Amino acid sequence: MTENIRPPLPPFTAETAAQKVRAAENAWNTHDPEKIALAYTVDSQWRNRAQFLAGRDEIVQFLKQKWAKELDYRLIKELWAFHDARIAVRFAYEWHDDSGNWFRSYGNENWEYDQNGLMQRRIASINDSPIAEAERKFHWPPGPRPDDHPGLSEFGF
């Protein structure tokens, strides 16, 4: 089976790296694990916090569990750096648990892509910060962030 091709392809420019970051943000904001997993190689390697994953099946299961726990999830990613087939991003997302406790999670990701533009490695470090519901900043309807919505830098995050 041939893998799909997911432009833009490496080596990245500032413009194509930013496109990759926004595409990933938009996909994660759909909360569709099966669709999201298609952006990764079939044998993609992940470290998310202290959890290690291998392959699309584990990615799908991980994302299903994540969004069963992290409710009303809204994510913003921002390009930090890029070189050849690698991209570094910083991000923040807001969510609440089933008890109504709100959090803003801050983190950094390192991504490595194959020649088809599929992510083959994702390394994520994340910290959760409790917030009051009134402190929330990400209020758009479910789905991708509107183009005119502020990004991380505009919020000072």
Model-derived segments and their meaning:
Residues 1-42, 153-157:
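Short, low-complexity N-terminal intrinsically disordered segments enriched in polar/charged residues
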Residues 2-12, 61-157:
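A beta-strand edge to alpha-helix "cap/lid" segment located at domain peripheries
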Residues 15-18, 33-87:
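A solvent-exposed, acidic/Ser-Thr-rich amphipathic alpha-helical stretch
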